[in-house]
A protein has these predicted regions:
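Bacterial N-terminal signal peptides that target proteins for export
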Residues: 1-10
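Surface-exposed short loop/turn segments
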Residues: 25, 67-72, 79-124, 128, ...
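A periodicity- and composition-biased signal for non-globular, repetitive helical segments
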Residues: 10-11, 60
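A structural "domain/chain start" motif
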Residues: 2, 17-63, 68-70, 75-78, ...
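Compositionally biased, intrinsically disordered linkers/stalks adjacent to structured regions
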Residues: 147-167
Length: 167
């Protein structure tokens, strides 16, 4: 009986140690040979008509990477290059009140992200991502702008996480 308890405790301890060794917050890591990165200005192919949004996304991504400190951010000739294109910014009604009046709208932004290895001359990751936020129609233009800014912020967070975790 005593030997069974010792064996059980040993097996349980072994399993716990093995599971801990497999656990990771990021799911991967950045390639070790890449030390610096160039972040290109975001291109906006959405046709939405507000160049401010691409500038906001560009600056938010730069700020996140500077704070993260995984890569040295350089203007030219980085070991890696991050390119982002806003493909679409769409709006759609979310909820309608009695009398068929819109009460909430959804803003969805879709982007194509490419992370390129300038050292090995290959694409590390190319992915389409999207984010959205919902705003009250009664908030008019201010609500819409805030929803777009929130969606852009979430996209920037997703890009950072994707790049440093190896997507």
């Amino acid at each position: 009986m005593f030997n069974k308890k010792i064996i059980f405790v040993f097996i349980l301890t072994f399993v716990i140690v093995m599971i801990q060794g497999c656990y990771s917050f990021t799911g991967g890591s950045a390639p070790s040979h890449l030390k610096s990165m160039t972040i290109q200005n975001v291109n906006d192919n959405s046709g939405f008509g507000n160049p401010q949004y691409r500038e906001i996304l560009t600056q938010t991504i730069i700020d996140l990477f500077l704070n993260d400190n995984t890569y040295e951010i350089v203007d030219l000739s980085g070991d890696a290059r991050l390119s982002i294109v806003i493909n679409s910014i769409r709006e759609a009604p979310v909820s309608v009140s009695p009398g068929e009046l819109e009460t909430e709208r959804k803003v969805e932004i879709s982007c194509e992200v490419e992370f390129y290895d300038n050292v090995k001359k290959n694409v590390i990751m190319k992915k389409n991502i999207s984010s959205y936020d919902i705003y009250q129609v009664s908030e008019s233009q201010q609500g819409r702008d805030n929803a777009i800014r929130n969606a852009l912020s979430q996209l920037a967070d997703d890009v950072l996480l994707g790049v440093i975790s190896g997507w």
